[in-house]
Amino acid sequence: MRRPWTLLAIAVAMALLLPTLARATGYAIYEQGAAALGMAGASTASVKDASAVFFNPAALARLEGTRFYVGGSALAPITSVTGVGTADGARPEYGVTEEMVKQVFFPPTIYATHRLMKGLGFGIGVNSPYGLGVEWDADEFSGRYIATKVDLQTLNGSACLAWAPNDQWSFAGGADAMFAKVLLNKRTLYSNPMLGISDLDIIETEMTSDFVPGYGWNAAVLYTPAAQWRLGAFYRSKVVVHVDDAEADFTQILTGITAVDAYVTSILPPDQPGSTVLRFPALWSAGVAFDPEPDWTVEADFLWYEWSVFTDLPINLETTPALSSTRVEDYEDSWQVRVGAEHRRGDLAYRVGYYFDKSPAPGYAVSPLLPDADRIGVSLGVGWAFGPEKNWTLDAYGLGLFLNRRCGFTEDP
């Protein structure tokens, strides 16, 4: 039996972001397959490798043999905040720009599919569909009382079964188990104008958790009305993760001022258990693919994220509940449009794509904790089929992100 493999589907997604108060819309990661992302992710109707586990599980019923996919993306967000306030005490001051610490993230993608019999396919996958990495200079950043570091990691396991009753229709359903962990870090500042003291760092607060599971489901359909046309759609349900085993640690930062240090010692909360709730939105996608020539495919997709599930971020403390807090986010449902094209020539496939991603964050929710803005993405990709039976494929893509500047306002604590 011929066994197609997709090995090392290298997704080199260097995010070339304009310096703005932004990262990505929400905290979704759609970079889940190199071939698809070469077309800017427009693949709901045309995906034809094992990444169909993510992009459209209904396609599994039409994949022959056994297929494996191993890959990932290198994501390098660049974010800055520029002060626009003119009131006394505005942070940062008007015209002052502060840069986020540069980081690179490598979310993995692993898929395996198998055709059980004609018209029946099965697939499993592990990926990271959501994540957030924000870090600011803990000693100098003017917004350090909001956040100095945020690290949200997810690992999602999917299992899907697809059925094709005929050559035109195929359907799929599956289950998702998402494991999420979070780290939140910030500083507490102290000011006393009567003593001439301003913005002294006195307490560092850190909340961390282990991986905690949440569960969801998915469904998909693929329709081929004619040889040149394909219509596809999928749905992934929301996942809510209740983090009940977090640990909140409070560390005093000595100022060298005896009276201040004694005061902080007297009010310093003890290390204690904490909890929060992490909400991941449902996702709808619908796409249409057309082959104008045997060696060409073009596709357009429309995606809808139900970000309105992300209403707030509660921080609950067990020992000192009076210090618990809830950060209001009130995200709105948002949409994306993705278009792409692929040209196949011999053993090579050349890809290009474009997308627009509408930010779900209202202006008052834009902050150093969750910077966000509308974004435009442009991608280029290439695939190479090799091996004795051309059953190995190496795919790579590059993705440039260009974000609108976004103005947000956050009150001092």
Describe the role of every protein-language-model region.
Residues 61-62:
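N-terminal plug
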Residues 23-37, 44, 65, 81-83, ...:
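Outer-membrane beta-barrel porins/channels
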Residues 1-10:
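Bacterial N-terminal signal peptides that target proteins for export
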Residues 42-44, 67-77:
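Short strand-turn segments of transmembrane beta-barrel domains in outer membranes
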Residues 55-56:
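A beta-strand signature from Gram-negative outer-membrane beta-barrel systems
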Residues 9-19:
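Bacterial N-terminal signal peptides
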